[in-house]
Amino acid sequence: MEIPVLKNILETNDRIAAANARLFDDNGVTVLNFMSSPGAGKTSLVIKTLEAVKAAGISLAVIDGDIASTVDADRVAAFGVPAVQINTGGACHLDANMIKNALPKIDLAAIELLIIENVGNLVCPAEFQLGEHKKVMLLSVTEGDDKPLKYPLMFSEADALVVNKMDLLANTNFNMEGFQEIIGSMNPDVEMFLVSCTSGFGLDAWGEWMVKQVREVGKK
């Protein structure tokens, strides 16, 4: 039996997310929602991504979500990219209204790509639409290969799955073949990237995919 209060919260969120999406489309801005657990390397992937898209001549901004502090936004801003910090004050995810309230701080007409770095959590972020075009799920091999079984919604909702810290794979018990089989049955259409933000392994292919997303939305 569904709890009416939760249903109302999600319906209200979805309406605001739809309005956000229309605003993004009206301005020709591609929006990606980056999600992961804390410590998976999400901010490192954001930085590697902004380096790749900037090299392709794409203008962008970043919204960073955290319970507290401006640490991640400060790291992004150091690369000359506009960054807006959202502190949730305890909430384990961003929601569409938080994004709506942050957008006046960003000149959408001046950018082609907006990256939203969600709060580190494997449960709540997948439940709340923000108005994004694609969801990017990041997992590090040090977290273990059983996460899709424990947190299926996050993995089944993802449009792209980035497996980070591949440089440490040999030092873990992560079963890559078994993991890929689970993902293949759970989300057969997801695009998977094996990377290391430390060594640079796999980042060229990831950067090319990101640029492709911006180009495709720009053609609509």
Give a label for each model feature:
Residues 65, 140-141, 197:
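Cofactor-binding loop segments of dinucleotide-utilizing enzymes, especially the Rossmann-like FAD-
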Residues 45, 95, 147-150, 175, ...:
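Residues at alpha-helix caps and immediate loop-helix transition turns in enzyme cores, especially N-
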Residues 85-88, 139, 164:
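Short beta->alpha connector loops at strand-helix junctions that form conserved
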Residues 3-35, 40, 44, 49-133, ...:
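Nucleotide-state-sensitive switch-loop elements of NTP-binding domains
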Residues 168-220:
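Canonical P-loop GTPase G-domain recognition
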